[in-house]
């Protein structure tokens, strides 16, 4: 008996690495030391010497049960973008620049072409956020996971000068909330999605006029990465006072996390367009509006608070980075929390 008889194919692992190398190479930054295959990824910090007090930021996340849709649709080239987005958006939300990323794939069976396709999405997410893919792990788990399934997670490290960390300090009554459009559901709440819709190829491949695409394509749309937009705002000389990445828990959980005691956020629901996919989900699943806003981003993936005098500069900077911003509310004095009006 050998290792392959037990369900672990070492040769498939080697082939996966060879196939993914070209994708990884496309993400390299000058600070990366060495190549793929070492025991650890090395990244020089010499480029941050101009910072007064550099602080490293880290984030880890996955794609949740969104991967189930990738299995059903046999589409694996974008789920890696989601893994990167969930991590680097958190780093950027604190004011940081993502530096490097590592991925972790657990699978029932290592199909090299599929693994390389997944990593191509990870690499694309890294390119969109300007960080290097310095390493990763593909773990074959025979007997623990079905052969055609996998889970994907990632880890991002970034840097920010301590004085530039976004903490919510300095928020005042009248500060303006600006939200950036999402691509759709992003990467959370898919356990509910899978209860609302029948999860089979026929259902997911059905075209819907109101969506302008198939249900599966709308649901699998990769999470938007806001790193470049937030950097553009910073480069425009705007101080972002507070920032919230709208993920699991929706508006009600994530917006209060950007606030300080004594400040409350007011969001106007009609100030921006809610994507059709959320309207369809609410209708087909008979999901109450409050539950939708307590679970999903409802069309806004990132919300920042800025001084009223900086609104125009902020909007222009976000647009220049390719994002779609909306003025969606304001900060008021009051108990820490959020009101949707």
Swiss-Prot record:
It catalyses: 2-formamido-N(1)-(5-O-phospho-beta-D-ribosyl)acetamidine + ATP = 5-amino-1-(5-phospho-beta-D-ribosyl)imidazole + ADP + phosphate + H(+). CDD domains: PurM. Keywords: ATP-binding, Cytoplasm, Ligase, Nucleotide-binding, Purine biosynthesis. GO terms for cellular component: cytosol. The keyword Ribosomal protein does not apply. It comes from Agathobacter rectalis (strain ATCC 33656 / DSM 3377 / JCM 17463 / KCTC 5835 / VPI 0990) (Eubacterium rectale). Belongs to the AIR synthase family. It is an enzyme of class 6 (ligase). Its EC number is 6.3.3.1. GO terms for biological process: 'de novo' IMP biosynthetic process; adenine biosynthetic process. It is found in: Cytoplasm. HAMAP family: AIRS (MF_00741). This is Phosphoribosylformylglycinamidine cyclo-ligase. Pathway: Purine metabolism; IMP biosynthesis via de novo pathway; 5-amino-1-(5-phospho-D-ribosyl)imidazole from N(2)-formyl-N(1)-(5-phospho-D-ribosyl)glycinamide: step 2/2. One of its GO terms (molecular function) is phosphoribosylamine-glycine ligase activity.
